Amino acid sequence: LKNLKSHFIKISLFLIVALLFSSCSENPSITGYNLLNPLDSLVVKRFDSTNDSAFTYHKELIQKDVLGGTRRILVGKYGDLTASSLIRFIIGLSSEMKDAVKNSNLIVNSARIKLNPVYKFGDTTSNNFNLQVKEIYTYFDEYKFTIDSLKSGRYEIINENIVVRNIDDDTLYYSELKPEKVLNWFKLIAADSSKKLQGVLLEPDDFTNYIRGFASSNAYYVGDPIVLEVVVTYNNKTDSLKYFVDADLHVIEKTSEINFDQTKLVLQSGVKQKAFVFFDISSVPKNAIVNSAYLRLYPDTLESKYGTSYQDSLFVQYITDSTNISIDSAVTFVLTKTSSGYYEGQLNYFVQKWIDNNSNKGLLISIKDPDGGVEKFVFYGTQSAIYSKRPQLIINYTYRK
């Protein structure tokens, strides 16, 4: 047994010495390299779209997404943008109030819509901001309604501003309404008419020159962000009523056309202006293993415009069909602004998928907060005269030669 132990110790010492000798070779290599077939070799390379003269292309597009269920509603005008909002209140009357309305024994003393301002975009030093409120008598679905719906003519919207005056104290915004209009809403409810108020449309007047955001019914807000407050007198008593929101949304009209300028890449929230970007990576070998892949976008700070609060980051999504701009929504990467001023995000998964499946259809880039404001992110485009600031895809990869 002692001899067996002695032989085991000798063999172990021999293996340790051999291992130490091999690791102290004059030509150390990457892990596992010396185990490869001598005819094989691993190559580590970098692809850089701005240095490798790779073909790149981009175009902007607007996808008409619905804008219901957002944390803000937007109203106002600035430049080529006009924002309008639709609100539907839950308005009910007690049996006593219905009888009073039917007997012409109810008076609306005052009525107002209370809003909570949380955002501004445009010429915010101006005091030119006024709301118009118009009645809607056609039901609208906040999860299907778009700017095209508003312009379609299918919705009965009375073209009369029912605002008596607007009161703006920055912390709260009030639109005082014509009492006779609110009384008419009550009459339709009391008569159980098939024609009832379905909501109100909030529009800017002609002199408004900036856009404001108000906390919506979906906002994480203390209290009720939007309230219809009505004071009535009936049966010799006065009552203060509050009606809350059933649905709200905003729509934004952009009057200018998209300028297909390859020197600039423009993204804009509110109107859901996104960008399709393509990089030709055919020079990367088909058997490449992606170690890291980064996308960088360089902002044009003079052309970009931002509101008083916004999310300073972008979404990048994998395109499966470049004709219809269909995406794989399972994975989304984020570009964040670095201390160097450019936006950067890692795209290892996307690039490896391109290589493995020969499926490079491009990327869809959008603003992370697409409906909380109307921020305009302008980046240097794929044909910018400043070559170093063009959209940049960097791929560090390894392949067997």
Residue ranges and their predicted role:
Residues 2-15, 19-401:
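Secreted, disulfide-rich extracellular signaling modules
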